[in-house]
Amino acid sequence: MSAVCGGAARMLRTPGRHGYAAEFSPYLPGRLACATAQHYGIAGCGTLLILDPDEAGLRLFRSFDWNDGLFDVTWSENNEHVLITCSGDGSLQLWDTAKAAGPLQVYKEHAQEVYSVDWSQTRGEQLVVSGSWDQTVKLWDPTVGKSLCTFRGHESIIYSTIWSPHIPGCFASASGDQTLRIWDVKAAGVRIVIPAHQAEILSCDWCKYNENLLVTGAVDCSLRGWDLRNVRQPVFELLGHTYAIRRVKFSPFHASVLASCSYDFTVRFWNFSKPDSLLETVEHHTEFTCGLDFSLQSPTQVADCSWDETIKIYDPACLTIPA
């Protein structure tokens, strides 16, 4: 693997590994985890890459191999060294970056590929949710070797599961059944079902500044905002992508700014509160762009990864000026 620092972008090439997900550490500035797969995730192995910035661009701190493609990654909220990945063999893997050995624990219950995993952000609880092609969401306590609960209701692949950063025990899921669903761990069931698109929904995220606001990204190339107090119509719709939207993320620094990446090879930045909502289009990949994250420490820094075998950290121009 080779690092390049070109212009404002720091880049790491990952030969033979296609990027699926990227997430900045909530603790260490600049540290990035990236979940990758061989052969575009269709066959072969996977590798978890832990990267740090250096003078040359990006430095590989550690890598962990798994015997199937890795599709998502999430950092622990109470231990800076610990993170979880999920894979095509239906399992989740718990890793410790302070150790070069294999996973500390493997959780194998899903019957098909696990496409999404997220660690709860409210410090009072340490829970993980995973979403699978088997149409279920599972709830895990990482200290326990088996799931605590299984949530059923989706009628197709679950592509995205993400905890509310505001409400303990509440998470959202997005599915190929065209719905966004809000779940309550305490009730062990679904609270709200939103028919959000007339197409598969590949991603969702919560606004960091409004506990009632979520965004969905779908195969219909649209982003839609949803206010949980009234879900009959979206509160905003953002158009511009020309192929399916693979991932969407709200900014942790700006209440109305979000980013999306797509199978059209681009990353786009938006401010849904402005009439001209598209702030910037970044075109620096040559394949599907699947992973995307905002830095939690730097208001201007973003990371993405692509099937073109590159990982990039950069500062888009639109984030260096007031949104």
Swiss-Prot record:
InterPro entries, alphabetized: G-protein_beta_WD-40_rep, PEX7, WD40/YVTN_repeat-like_dom_sf, WD40_repeat_CS, WD40_repeat_dom_sf, WD40_rpt
WD repeat positions: 65-96, 109-141, 153-184, 196-227, 240-271, 284-315
Xref: SUPFAM superfamilies: WD40 repeat-like
Domain of life, source organism: Eukaryota
Subcellular location field: Cytoplasm, Cytosol; Peroxisome matrix
Reported impact of G217R: In RCDP1; uncertain significance
Effect after changing E113R: Impaired binding to cargo proteins containing a PTS2 peroxisomal targeting signal
SS bond partners: none
GO biological process: endochondral ossification; ether lipid biosynthetic process; fatty acid beta-oxidation; neuron migration; peroxisome organization; protein import into peroxisome matrix; protein targeting to peroxisome
GO CC term (a single one): cytosol
Gene3D superfamilies for the chain: YVTN repeat-like/Quinoprotein amine dehydrogenase (2.130.10.10)
Outcome of swapping E200R: Impaired binding to cargo proteins containing a PTS2 peroxisomal targeting signal
Location, primary (coarse class): cytoplasm
Leader peptide range in chain numbering: none
CDD domains linked to this entry: WD40
Keywords for this protein: Cataract, Cytoplasm, Deafness, Disease variant, Ichthyosis, Peroxisome, Peroxisome biogenesis disorder, Protein transport, Repeat, Retinitis pigmentosa, Rhizomelic chondrodysplasia punctata, Transport, WD repeat
Impact noted for substituting E287R: Impaired interaction with PEX5, leading to decreased peroxisomal import of proteins containing a PTS2 peroxisomal targeting signal
Entries under PANTHER family matching the protein: PEROXISOMAL TARGETING SIGNAL 2 RECEPTOR (PTHR46027:SF1)
Family designation: Belongs to the WD repeat peroxin-7 family.
Name used for this protein in its record: Peroxisomal targeting signal 2 receptor
